[in-house]
Curated annotation (Swiss-Prot):
PANTHER family: RIBOSOMAL PROTEIN S7
Organism encoding this protein: Parvibaculum lavamentivorans (strain DS-1 / DSM 13023 / NCIMB 13966)
Keywords: Ribonucleoprotein, Ribosomal protein, RNA-binding, rRNA-binding, tRNA-binding
Family: Belongs to the universal ribosomal protein uS7 family.
Protein name (database record): Small ribosomal subunit protein uS7
Keyword Nuclease tagged: no
PROSITE patterns for the chain: RIBOSOMAL_S7
Record Pfam families: Ribosomal_S7
InterPro entries: Ribosomal_uS7, Ribosomal_uS7_bac/org-type, Ribosomal_uS7_CS, Ribosomal_uS7_dom, Ribosomal_uS7_dom_sf
Length: 156
């Protein structure tokens, strides 16, 4: 059954320690099975570890990491006359942030440190310094968009 109106965007409650809405969104994405306290423990532990290991402001480093991972372009499939083209399109700001969060979490989970705290802090530090799997994912996305620039006139 279709909706009569578009669903309203819900306001995200800022996280308890830093009062940051984007960090709260990150926490919600990291969470499994509604276990928010576990996600909180992981994130705050990673922030503490970043502060001790690299002596940096963890919140600023987190935002730098997100900024470095956010893609500007992506490709979307467009079917034209029996052929499917990968058409490069600009990414909306909210989707850019969502993709960056998703990629950082996926890259952190794929790392081989012992605890998730260590993995997340390592990936955030790498992303803030333009290294790591999440940044590579963004570069691959941009490369794909650049390779398919010839089809950009199919944009919709």
């Amino acid at each position: 059954m279709s909706r009569r109106h578009r669903a309203e965007k819900r306001d995200v409650i800022p996280d308890a320690k830093y009062g940051d809405v984007i960090l709260a969104k990150f926490m919600n994405s990291l969470m499994y099975h509604g276990k928010k306290s576990a996600a909180e423990t992981i994130i705050y532990g990673a922030f503490d570890q970043m502060q001790q290991k690299a002596s940096v402001d963890p919140l600023r480093t987190f935002h730098e990491a997100l900024e470095n991972v956010m893609p500007a372009l992506e490709v979307r499939s467009r079917r034209v006359g029996g052929a499917t083209y990968q058409v490069p399109v600009e990414v909306r700001p909210d989707r850019r942030r969502a993709l960056a969060i998703r990629w950082i979490i996926a890259a952190a989970r794929a790392r081989n440190e012992t605890t998730m705290v260590a993995r997340l802090s390592g990936e955030l530090l790498d992303a803030a310094n333009n290294r790591g799997s999440a940044v590579k994912k963004r570069e691959d996305t941009h490369r794909m968009a650049e390779a398919n620039r010839a089809f950009s006139h199919y944009r919709w």
